[in-house]
């Protein structure tokens, strides 16, 4: 698998478990002999939802909720077969969404 690149994109609502997962991936890839670039922090998406506090009237009284999606990018350059095998066996938290591109 020479001259290839694996791009891993991580998404999560909690930045702490996201950073822990990224550190696990980087550590696993480095131990198996691959070159690693990252984790690179990508812009955080912020979704804001505004709702009325009252049911019928009082339109001026509103409440806002927000949902932040944190993202990280990891590039693994020149992965070995051991790298791919180790990444497949890696156990990550359920709150982290992983997208892998070869």
UniProtKB/Swiss-Prot annotation:
GO terms for biological process: translation. SUPFAM superfamilies: Ribosomal protein S10. It holds the Pfam family Ribosomal_S10. One of its GO terms (molecular function) is structural constituent of ribosome. Disulfide bonds: none annotated. Keywords: Ribonucleoprotein, Ribosomal protein. GO terms for cellular component: ribonucleoprotein complex; ribosome. PANTHER family: 30S RIBOSOMAL PROTEIN S10 FAMILY MEMBER (PTHR11700). Involved in the binding of tRNA to the ribosomes. Part of the 30S ribosomal subunit. Belongs to the universal ribosomal protein uS10 family. This is Small ribosomal subunit protein uS10.
């Amino acid at each position: 698998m020479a001259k290839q690149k694996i791009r891993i994109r991580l998404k999560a609502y909690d930045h702490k478990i996201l950073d822990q997962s990224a550190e696990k991936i980087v550590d696993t890839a480095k131990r198996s002999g691959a070159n690693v670039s990252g984790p690179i922090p990508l812009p955080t998406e912020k979704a804001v939802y505004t709702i009325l506090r009252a049911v019928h009237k009082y339109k001026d009284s509103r409440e806002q909720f927000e949902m932040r999606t944190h993202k990280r990018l990891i590039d693994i350059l020149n992965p070995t077969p051991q790298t791919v095998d180790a990444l497949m066996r890696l156990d990550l938290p359920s709150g982290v969404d992983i997208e892998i591109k070869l």
